[in-house]
A protein has these predicted regions:
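Macrodomain-like recognition of ADP-ribose-binding/processing modules
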Residues: 1-269
Length: 269
């Protein structure tokens, strides 16, 4: 893709993002206000997260699937019970580069929902984060927002292609920046990553989630390895007594998808 085409597409996304943000603020004003009110902060100066106990004899592992889908498509495919999706968040900026035309997972969630309109009402969360960067490994911090309204590919504002789901907003350790600027070792990154994954699952458990939609957490510009992330999630799901019924890893059809399929199927044998 030429730079000109890239720039044109980014400018188009910027325009669409601003239009979507303004439209949501008008059409979904009451729903946004309620979601803002019900959003909880975990970690740091927020709520403590109870650690889920080790599995008891006879406990079951959730039904785990890997789908070559983006998060929103997976949500519309799997949403039945109480469902939450993991937002692979920017640690310091609500919505990441949503209004700047970026197109990573968080920005795509914002384009298809009321999420951005909720995140911007929690500046204290991001201010605290900006003061506690932990050499770019960041910290175990999350926002849990209830009843975010999602639209199927942003195509309509009316049923049946509209639903509500919870969103767990959490940043993965940024190994790319941590190793380059903070002299963080691979072992230090792995320790932070595994604890972050456990933290995410514990927050979801604390909110009684039935269906949890995850994915290649931190495997883009943050530099995490998809195989390691897949094994990390699988490890905690097997070892701890989580009560999720279904866990879906939504990973678009790339090398990351192949790694997730390989590691999850290998771990299941």
């Amino acid at each position: 893709m030429s730079y000109y085409n890239y720039y044109q597409k980014k400018e188009k996304r910027k325009s669409e993002a601003l239009e979507h943000f303004r439209k949501m603020d008008i059409l979904m004003k009451d729903e946004i206000r309620q979601s803002v009110k019900e959003t909880k902060t975990y970690g740091g100066n927020g709520l403590p997260v109870p650690h889920t106990e080790k599995k008891r004899p006879g406990s079951t592992v959730p039904n785990i699937t890997v789908e070559p889908l983006d998060t929103v498509s997976a949500l519309f495919l799997h949403q039945q019970r109480k469902t939450a999706v993991l937002n692979f968040a920017s640690y310091q900026n609500p919505g990441g580069g949503f209004l700047e035309g970026s197109s990573a997972q968080e920005e795509c969630l914002c384009h298809a929902s009321t999420l951005y309109n909720i995140l911007i009402h929690h500046p204290e969360f991001y201010t605290w984060n900006s003061r506690h960067k932990n050499n770019s490994l960041y910290t175990d911090r999350a926002l849990y927002s209830k009843n975010i309204i999602f639209f199927d590919n942003g195509a309509t504002l009316t049923p049946p292609r509209q639903l509500k789901a919870d969103v767990l907003t959490c940043a993965a350790p940024n190994y790319s920046a941590a190793s380059k600027y903070g002299s963080v070792s691979a072992d230090e990154n792995l320790t932070a990553l595994l604890e972050r994954i456990r933290f995410v699952l514990d927050v979801a458990e604390d909110n009684h989630v039935d269906t949890l939609i995850l994915g290649a957490f931190g495997c883009g510009v943050f530099g995490q390895d998809a195989a390691v992330v897949a094994c990390g999630f699988k490890r905690w799901l097997e070892q701890r007594d989580y009560r999720f019924k279904d866990v879906c890893f939504a990973v678009p059809d790339t090398e990351n998808y192949k790694k997730f399929r390989l590691m999850i199927s290998r771990e299941n044998k």
